């Protein structure tokens, strides 16, 4: 499973820490946290981290289908990924990749690198609950977010945007929103929340990298990406939450928090800040 990282190191001559993180759909978030740790602990000046996935094939589709995790809107695939909608019925497999260069700040300045933002915190936890279902009250997700906020040295009130895992599954969306509200308290009504999986599908192991990039561009462009395809909000969801439904919203984003979770109860959170 480490051939992807090994190939990149050989192609570009990277001789620092080199391995693949394997934690289902949380993998690339965990990889970014590992890269962040390597730099701040003085083990590297520059790290490349990300993820890739090409899962539109018979084994992957068959496996997830047997778990009843996939949407069955086969006649309307463009609208099948619909986080927070009362008629959501599972996720849509996406394919893609994303990679980010993490670099010690003074090192980046010295070489004149273009700096988009800074990563300031990472958190990880386990649900210790079920192989495929999240904890119904989002306990593991709350721990991951709280640990990331503590690691970043900020307050919940500093968060402007949350890119949720939001896979469009009946079991997953609401516990995550409960967790976000539990962590942010009343400030949850001041933040934008969205699931970019509504547009990309679920990139599985690459989800964290792709969604980190969505957060970074929200910071650099001052535009929060939307949650599309939500036509009828699930009645169990607080209607006062700003889920950035169906249209991007302009706002200053100083701090963005990104969640990715994986089967097996793997939870991970990264936080980026404007610089």
What do these predicted ranges mean?
Residues 1-34, 43, 66-92, 180-209:
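Conserved catalytic cysteine-centered active-site region
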Residues 10, 100-104, 150, 181, ...:
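Short beta-strand-to-turn element immediately C-terminal to the catalytic PLP-Schiff-base lysine
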Residues 152-158, 189, 238-275:
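Flexible, low-complexity linker/loop segments at domain and module junctions
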Residues 1-24, 52-61, 156-172:
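Conserved beta-ketoacyl condensing-enzyme motif
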Residues 8, 28, 35, 64, ...:
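Conserved small-residue
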Residues 18-23, 44-52, 114-122, 157-164, ...:
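Beta-strand segments within the central parallel beta-sheet cores of soluble alpha/beta enzyme folds
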Residues 75-152, 161:
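Condensing-enzyme catalytic core mediating Claisen C-C bond formation in acyl metabolism
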Residues 54-81, 123-143, 167-180, 206, ...:
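Active-site-adjacent elements of ketosynthase-type condensing enzymes
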């Amino acid at each position: 499973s480490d051939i992807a990282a090994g190939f990149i190191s050989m192609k570009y001559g990277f001789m620092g820490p080199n391995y693949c993180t394997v934690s289902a759909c949380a993998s690339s978030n965990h990889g970014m946290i590992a890269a962040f740790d390597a730099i701040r602990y003085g083990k590297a000046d520059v790290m490349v981290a990300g993820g890739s996935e090409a899962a539109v094939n018979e084994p992957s589709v068959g496996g997830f289908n047997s778990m009843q995790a996939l949407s069955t809107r086969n006649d309307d695939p463009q609208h099948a990924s619909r986080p927070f909608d009362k008629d959501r019925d599972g996720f849509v497999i996406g394919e893609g990749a994303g990679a980010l260069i993490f670099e010690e700040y003074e090192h980046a300045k010295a070489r004149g690198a273009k700096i988009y933002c800074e990563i300031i915190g990472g958190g990880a936890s386990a649900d210790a609950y079920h192989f495929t279902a999240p904890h119904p009250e989002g306990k593991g997700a709350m721990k991951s977010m709280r640990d990331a906020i503590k690691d970043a040295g900020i307050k919940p009130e500093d968060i402007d945007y949350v890119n949720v895992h939001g896979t469009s599954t009946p079991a997953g969306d609401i516990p995550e929103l409960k967790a976000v509200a539990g962590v942010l308290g009343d400030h949850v009504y001041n933040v934008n929340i969205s699931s970019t999986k509504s547009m990309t599908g679920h990139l599985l192991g690459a989800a964290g990298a792709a969604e980190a990039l969505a957060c970074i561009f929200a910071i650099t462009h001052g535009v929060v990406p939307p949650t599309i395809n939500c036509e009828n909000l699930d009645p169990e969801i607080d209607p006062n939450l700003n889920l950035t439904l169906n249209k991007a919203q302009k706002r200053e984003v100083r701090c963005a928090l990104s969640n990715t979770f994986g089967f097996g109860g793997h939870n991970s959170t990264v936080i980026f800040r404007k610089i």
